[in-house]
């Protein structure tokens, strides 16, 4: 199965990252596992009306990955927490929640522009 690399402009990602967007690797759940430690979770109702479960480090509080209950077969991994230069992902595939992009940013060239979630 494929992996999608997406920049998310939703308000929740902006707030959680204290930034204009978050960088995510959306991967099949069956190919994902936490290899060290134990995560803590909290959830909220997303724009889709479904719960979104946020998994974060219990020691430092960094967001690690999300579980959109609307899409139960995938996890949305925050690229900055990946080992082996996870933030150097090469080209990205899409921007999501483009309707919430902050005014001072332009669309990233060559990326699919998606209103709402994938």
Task: List each language-model region with its residue ranges.
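A short Gly-Trp-Pro
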Residues: 1-118
